[in-house]
Protein backbone atom coordinates (compact mmCIF):
# COMPACT_ATOMS: atom_id res chain seq x y z
CA UNK A 1 0.00 0.00 0.00
CA UNK A 2 1.34 3.43 -0.94
CA UNK A 3 2.09 5.98 1.76
CA UNK A 4 0.71 9.52 1.74
CA UNK A 5 4.16 10.80 0.74
CA UNK A 6 4.48 8.39 -2.19
CA UNK A 7 1.05 9.24 -3.54
CA UNK A 8 1.80 12.97 -3.47
CA UNK A 9 5.17 12.39 -5.12
CA UNK A 10 3.45 10.52 -7.96
CA UNK A 11 1.63 13.76 -8.81
CA UNK A 12 4.66 16.00 -8.38
CA UNK A 13 3.06 17.83 -5.47
CA UNK A 14 5.39 19.81 -3.22
CA UNK A 15 5.33 19.38 0.52
CA UNK A 16 7.36 19.59 3.71
CA UNK A 17 7.75 16.75 6.20
CA UNK A 18 5.65 18.40 8.94
CA UNK A 19 2.79 18.70 6.44
CA UNK A 20 2.99 14.99 5.61
CA UNK A 21 2.93 14.17 9.32
CA UNK A 22 -0.25 16.19 9.76
CA UNK A 23 -1.90 14.63 6.71
CA UNK A 24 -0.98 11.16 8.01
CA UNK A 25 -2.72 11.94 11.30
CA UNK A 26 -5.72 13.44 9.50
CA UNK A 27 -6.18 10.40 7.23
CA UNK A 28 -5.86 8.13 10.26
CA UNK A 29 -8.64 10.06 11.99
CA UNK A 30 -10.74 10.10 8.82
CA UNK A 31 -10.56 6.35 8.31
CA UNK A 32 -11.64 5.83 11.89
CA UNK A 33 -14.92 7.74 11.74
CA UNK A 34 -18.41 6.34 10.95
CA UNK A 35 -19.52 5.92 7.34
CA UNK A 36 -21.74 9.00 7.38
CA UNK A 37 -18.68 11.28 7.51
CA UNK A 38 -16.62 9.55 4.84
CA UNK A 39 -17.12 6.88 2.21
CA UNK A 40 -13.43 6.00 2.08
CA UNK A 41 -12.21 2.93 3.89
CA UNK A 42 -8.64 2.69 2.57
CA UNK A 43 -5.65 5.03 2.54
CA UNK A 44 -5.20 5.23 -1.23
CA UNK A 45 -8.80 6.27 -1.85
CA UNK A 46 -8.82 8.71 1.07
CA UNK A 47 -5.61 10.45 -0.04
CA UNK A 48 -6.72 10.76 -3.66
CA UNK A 49 -10.16 12.12 -2.78
CA UNK A 50 -9.26 14.34 0.15
CA UNK A 51 -5.72 15.54 -0.57
CA UNK A 52 -4.66 15.10 -4.21
CA UNK A 53 -8.01 16.27 -5.59
CA UNK A 54 -7.72 19.48 -3.57
CA UNK A 55 -4.06 20.36 -4.19
CA UNK A 56 -3.56 19.29 -7.80
CA UNK A 57 -5.33 22.20 -9.58
CA UNK A 58 -3.86 24.94 -7.36
CA UNK A 59 -1.08 26.79 -9.17
CA UNK A 60 -0.61 29.71 -6.79
CA UNK A 61 0.08 30.24 -3.11
CA UNK A 62 -3.02 30.98 -1.08
CA UNK A 63 -2.77 33.50 1.75
CA UNK A 64 -5.20 35.65 3.68
CA UNK A 65 -8.56 34.41 4.93
CA UNK A 66 -10.51 31.43 3.65
CA UNK A 67 -13.99 30.13 4.47
CA UNK A 68 -14.88 26.48 3.80
CA UNK A 69 -18.67 26.18 3.50
CA UNK A 70 -20.24 22.85 4.46
CA UNK A 71 -16.84 21.56 5.52
CA UNK A 72 -18.06 18.12 6.63
CA UNK A 73 -14.91 16.07 7.19
CA UNK A 74 -12.69 19.14 6.68
CA UNK A 75 -12.18 19.07 2.93
CA UNK A 76 -11.06 21.26 1.30
CA UNK A 77 -10.47 23.77 4.11
CA UNK A 78 -8.45 21.64 6.51
CA UNK A 79 -6.13 20.39 3.76
CA UNK A 80 -5.59 23.94 2.50
CA UNK A 81 -4.76 25.06 6.04
CA UNK A 82 -2.10 22.34 6.33
CA UNK A 83 -0.39 23.14 3.02
CA UNK A 84 -0.81 26.94 3.02
CA UNK A 85 0.39 28.18 6.40
CA UNK A 86 -0.32 31.83 5.53
CA UNK A 87 -4.03 31.09 5.29
CA UNK A 88 -6.37 31.72 8.20
CA UNK A 89 -9.19 29.20 7.70
CA UNK A 90 -12.74 28.99 9.04
CA UNK A 91 -14.49 25.63 8.67
CA UNK A 92 -18.25 26.14 8.57
CA UNK A 93 -20.79 23.36 9.14
CA UNK A 94 -24.22 23.19 10.72
CA UNK A 95 -24.02 19.54 11.82
CA UNK A 96 -22.96 18.75 15.37
CA UNK A 97 -21.24 15.50 14.40
CA UNK A 98 -19.07 17.19 11.77
CA UNK A 99 -18.20 20.11 14.04
CA UNK A 100 -17.13 17.79 16.87
CA UNK A 101 -14.98 15.73 14.48
CA UNK A 102 -13.32 18.85 13.07
CA UNK A 103 -12.56 20.32 16.48
CA UNK A 104 -11.00 17.04 17.56
CA UNK A 105 -8.81 16.84 14.46
CA UNK A 106 -7.65 20.45 14.77
CA UNK A 107 -6.60 19.79 18.37
CA UNK A 108 -4.76 16.56 17.49
CA UNK A 109 -2.98 18.17 14.54
CA UNK A 110 -2.16 21.28 16.59
CA UNK A 111 -3.36 23.59 13.80
CA UNK A 112 -3.27 27.21 14.90
CA UNK A 113 -4.59 28.71 11.65
CA UNK A 114 -7.97 26.94 11.68
CA UNK A 115 -11.22 27.48 13.58
CA UNK A 116 -14.66 25.84 13.37
CA UNK A 117 -18.07 27.52 13.39
CA UNK A 118 -21.40 25.70 13.77
CA UNK A 119 -23.92 27.66 11.69
CA UNK A 120 -25.92 27.59 8.49
CA UNK A 121 -24.17 29.21 5.54
CA UNK A 122 -27.11 31.52 4.86
CA UNK A 123 -26.86 33.03 8.36
CA UNK A 124 -23.06 33.14 8.47
CA UNK A 125 -22.72 34.87 5.09
CA UNK A 126 -25.24 37.50 6.11
CA UNK A 127 -23.49 38.16 9.44
CA UNK A 128 -19.91 38.12 8.10
CA UNK A 129 -20.25 40.01 4.83
CA UNK A 130 -17.18 40.91 2.78
CA UNK A 131 -14.80 39.27 5.27
CA UNK A 132 -12.92 36.54 3.36
CA UNK A 133 -10.33 36.55 0.58
CA UNK A 134 -11.48 33.09 -0.52
CA UNK A 135 -14.60 31.00 -0.07
CA UNK A 136 -14.48 27.34 -1.04
CA UNK A 137 -16.80 24.34 -1.11
CA UNK A 138 -16.97 20.80 -2.39
CA UNK A 139 -19.97 18.46 -2.70
CA UNK A 140 -22.32 20.90 -0.95
CA UNK A 141 -24.77 22.06 -3.63
CA UNK A 142 -25.14 22.97 -7.28
CA UNK A 143 -23.26 26.04 -8.47
CA UNK A 144 -26.21 28.46 -8.48
CA UNK A 145 -26.90 27.66 -4.81
CA UNK A 146 -23.22 27.94 -3.86
CA UNK A 147 -22.91 31.34 -5.51
CA UNK A 148 -25.80 32.68 -3.43
CA UNK A 149 -24.80 31.27 -0.05
CA UNK A 150 -21.03 31.88 -0.39
CA UNK A 151 -20.52 35.16 -2.26
CA UNK A 152 -21.83 37.62 0.37
CA UNK A 153 -19.05 36.54 2.78
CA UNK A 154 -16.41 37.17 0.10
CA UNK A 155 -14.51 40.44 -0.17
CA UNK A 156 -14.90 42.39 -3.39
CA UNK A 157 -12.02 41.18 -5.56
CA UNK A 158 -11.95 37.87 -3.69
CA UNK A 159 -12.18 34.41 -5.25
CA UNK A 160 -14.67 31.57 -5.02
CA UNK A 161 -12.95 28.17 -5.33
CA UNK A 162 -15.46 25.43 -6.13
CA UNK A 163 -14.46 21.81 -6.71
CA UNK A 164 -16.74 20.11 -9.23
CA UNK A 165 -17.04 17.00 -11.38
CA UNK A 166 -17.48 16.71 -15.16
CA UNK A 167 -21.03 18.14 -15.03
CA UNK A 168 -19.71 21.62 -14.20
CA UNK A 169 -20.52 22.93 -17.71
CA UNK A 170 -24.22 22.30 -17.17
CA UNK A 171 -24.01 23.88 -13.72
CA UNK A 172 -22.29 26.97 -15.14
CA UNK A 173 -25.10 27.50 -17.63
CA UNK A 174 -27.63 27.07 -14.84
CA UNK A 175 -25.80 29.56 -12.59
CA UNK A 176 -25.73 32.55 -14.94
CA UNK A 177 -28.52 34.43 -13.16
CA UNK A 178 -27.04 33.78 -9.72
CA UNK A 179 -23.63 34.98 -10.90
CA UNK A 180 -25.12 38.17 -12.32
CA UNK A 181 -27.24 38.85 -9.22
CA UNK A 182 -24.40 38.21 -6.74
CA UNK A 183 -21.80 40.09 -8.85
CA UNK A 184 -19.32 37.34 -9.66
CA UNK A 185 -17.75 36.27 -12.93
CA UNK A 186 -15.97 33.13 -14.04
CA UNK A 187 -12.23 33.75 -14.07
CA UNK A 188 -10.99 30.31 -15.08
CA UNK A 189 -11.70 26.60 -15.05
CA UNK A 190 -8.91 24.14 -14.32
CA UNK A 191 -9.77 20.67 -15.53
CA UNK A 192 -7.66 17.78 -14.26
CA UNK A 193 -7.69 14.01 -13.89
CA UNK A 194 -6.64 11.68 -11.10
CA UNK A 195 -4.74 8.48 -11.78
CA UNK A 196 -7.85 6.67 -10.57
CA UNK A 197 -9.48 7.80 -13.83
CA UNK A 198 -11.73 10.39 -12.20
CA UNK A 199 -12.13 13.75 -13.94
CA UNK A 200 -12.43 16.92 -11.88
CA UNK A 201 -12.56 20.70 -12.30
CA UNK A 202 -11.74 23.66 -10.08
CA UNK A 203 -13.97 26.63 -10.87
CA UNK A 204 -12.46 30.00 -9.92
CA UNK A 205 -14.91 32.90 -9.81
CA UNK A 206 -14.06 36.52 -8.95
CA UNK A 207 -16.33 38.92 -7.10
CA UNK A 208 -16.21 42.25 -8.95
CA UNK A 209 -18.74 44.23 -6.88
CA UNK A 210 -20.52 44.01 -3.52
CA UNK A 211 -23.47 41.61 -3.51
CA UNK A 212 -26.94 43.07 -2.86
CA UNK A 213 -27.96 43.07 0.81
CA UNK A 214 -30.99 40.86 0.08
CA UNK A 215 -28.66 37.88 -0.50
CA UNK A 216 -28.40 35.28 0.76
CA UNK A 217 -32.08 34.68 1.29
CA UNK A 218 -33.26 33.11 4.55
CA UNK A 219 -32.20 29.61 5.62
CA UNK A 220 -33.28 26.90 3.21
CA UNK A 221 -34.64 29.15 0.48
CA UNK A 222 -31.56 29.07 -1.81
CA UNK A 223 -31.80 25.27 -1.84
CA UNK A 224 -35.58 25.07 -2.28
CA UNK A 225 -35.91 27.93 -4.76
CA UNK A 226 -32.50 28.39 -6.44
CA UNK A 227 -31.87 31.33 -8.72
CA UNK A 228 -32.44 30.13 -12.28
From Swiss-Prot:
Belongs to the methyltransferase superfamily. RNA methyltransferase RsmG family. GO terms for cellular component: cytosol. It is an enzyme of class 2 (transferase). Its main location: cytoplasm. It comes from Thermotoga petrophila (strain ATCC BAA-488 / DSM 13995 / JCM 10881 / RKU-1). It comes from the Bacteria. The keyword Methyltransferase applies. Its EC number is 2.1.1.-. Specifically methylates the N7 position of a guanine in 16S rRNA. One of its GO terms (molecular function) is rRNA (guanine-N7-)-methyltransferase activity. It is found in: Cytoplasm. It holds the Pfam family GidB. S-adenosyl-L-methionine binds at residues 70, 121-122, 138. Keywords: Cytoplasm, Methyltransferase, rRNA processing, S-adenosyl-L-methionine, Transferase. This is Ribosomal RNA small subunit methyltransferase G.
Amino acid sequence: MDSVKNILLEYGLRFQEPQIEKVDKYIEELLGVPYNLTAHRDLDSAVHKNVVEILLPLKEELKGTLLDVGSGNGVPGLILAIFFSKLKVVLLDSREKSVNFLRGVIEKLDLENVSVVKERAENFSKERREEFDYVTARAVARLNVLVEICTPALKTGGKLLFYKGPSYIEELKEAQRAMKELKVELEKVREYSLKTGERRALLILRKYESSPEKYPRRVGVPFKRPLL
